[in-house]
Amino acid sequence: MTSFRDKAILITGGAGFIGSEAVNQLLNEGAKVTVFDNFSSGKKHYLPKGNKKLRIIKGDITNERAVINVTKDQEIVLHLAALPFIPDSFYYPVDFFKVNTIGSMHVFWSAVKSKTVETVVNISTSEIYGSAQYTPMDENHPTSPYSTYAVSKLAADRAAFTLHKENGFPVVILRPFNTFGPRYTEPYIIPEIIGQILRGTKELNLGNVNSTRDFTFVSDTVKAMISAAKEKKAIGEIINIGSQNEIRIGDLVTKLSKIAKIKTKIKRDE
């Protein structure tokens, strides 16, 4: 497979949970990595120190000029920067469209105008599919987003494909399911369960524990991202990232309780 040694790679949202793992894997390949992050949720201490091939720039994808400047001379773009927390999208819908849709358009258009960008990997979300009409959910599953977050991400996907058709924009759309691993924090489901268990919560309050999720470890999600960036045949395609194995939230609680060696009870929804 293609080597990314000395490849100029931009990671928007590179100080986040998934982005920082991408930074580590790409630096291990010898790539020249630029992180572009506003540090609203990403952390500088997630990133390695003292690596001469790592450049960190504080900036926001809603700032078109800043995006143009940072995209210049890049060869690969991994676009992860987003507002990701679904409940917030119900209260701040305009902000979600400003960042997830308009901000993404800034990244896409800057790449189109660049003379050096070979591939943009846009990290979308499985949330755009809505409730499963069948399982496993494949790339042909109908899109039926139920949150402003999901709609804002789907709008960015559609914009990316329009640019691909009209301008030859070299984009790959990846739709991860539930990614977990180090630096994954509350209030997302796995750290939320672990947090409640370790705090000694008498009855874990998790909502509907009969719902199911497909979980992928963060290093595997990032490997898929890097593979997509290297594969020219992936350009213009949608690719789901998941394990094709689902687990009930209630069963997940049982597994985590056994690992922690702490007995737990679950508060049932009335």
Question: Could you say what each language-model-derived stretch is?
Answer:
Residues 182-185, 244:
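Structured loop/turn residues at secondary-structure junctions
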Residues 148, 186-187, 218, 249:
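Amphipathic alpha-helical segment in the mid-to-C-terminal domain
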Residues 178, 184, 211-213:
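Heptad-repeat alpha-helical coiled-coil signaling segments
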Residues 64, 108, 190, 218-226:
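Short, amphipathic alpha-helical "lid/cap" segments that border enzyme active or binding sites
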Residues 39, 89, 193, 206-209:
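Generic structural signal for conserved hydrophobic packing positions in ordered secondary structure
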Residues 28, 59, 198-270:
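C-terminal substrate-binding subdomain of Rossmann-fold SDR/epimerase-dehydratase oxidoreductases
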Residues 1-179, 259:
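N-terminal Rossmann-like NAD(P)+-binding domain of SDR-like oxidoreductases, especially those catalyzing
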Residues 104, 157, 190-191, 249, ...:
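A general structural signal for well-ordered alpha-helical segments in protein cores
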